[in-house]
Swiss-Prot record:
This is Phosphopantetheine adenylyltransferase. HAMAP family: PPAT_bact (MF_00151). Its main location: cytoplasm. It comes from Legionella pneumophila (strain Corby). The lineage of its organism: Bacteria, Pseudomonadati, Pseudomonadota, Gammaproteobacteria, Legionellales. One of its GO terms (biological process) is coenzyme A biosynthetic process. Homohexamer. The keyword Cell membrane does not apply.
Length: 163
């Protein structure tokens, strides 16, 4: 039986590695909710609504995929959405340790929720939202790392800051 999955993240901004995970997951799960977190512990570069709309624009063409913002405990959100799977992406060993710990905690919070991991395509494994923001801040070319709509929005933000 195929289940609905939740792919959570801050997506600040969404990158091509996020899009790769979402695209591949959309062929595995009949419904994939990309959950844009309002993480109060992180100072976001883009406001929540912008992150959500950039993501929606980037994956809107995929069947069975929709973006939803959330600001509560992930396990609670997963259960509210009648999903049973949290999908997480792993780029490197450094991601694994943190994600393994989260998966264990989520399992402890609810036996009804499982965590599954996908790795991105090899040529995307080094991309992170943080690195993209740093490159953009120094006027570097980020077009190979993020969708075109994100490039436009980051350039717009940089231009506003330089005024």
């Amino acid at each position: 039986m195929k289940q609905k999955a939740i792919y959570p993240g801050t997506f600040d901004p969404c990158t091509k590695w996020h899009i790769d995970i979402i695209t591949r997951a959309s062929t595995i799960f009949p419904e994939l909710i990309v959950a844009v977190a309002s993480n109060k512990n992180k100072a976001a570069y883009f406001i929540w609504e912008s992150r959500n709309s950039l993501l929606e624009e980037s994956v809107g063409h995929l069947t069975g995929v929709r973006g939803v913002g959330f600001d509560n405990l992930l396990n609670d959100f997963v259960l509210e959405q009648n999903a049973g799977i949290i999908l997480r992406g792993l780029r490197a060993v450094s991601d694994f340790e943190y994600e393994f710990q989260l998966a264990g905690m989520n399992r402890k919070l609810s036996k009804k929720v499982e965590t599954l991991f996908l790795t991105p395509a090899e040529h995307l494994m080094y991309i992170s939202s943080t690195l993209v923001r740093e490159i953009a801040a120094l006027n570097g070319d980020i077009s190979q790392f993020v969708p075109p709509n994100v490039v436009r929005e980051l350039k717009k933000r940089q231009n506003e800051r330089s005024l």
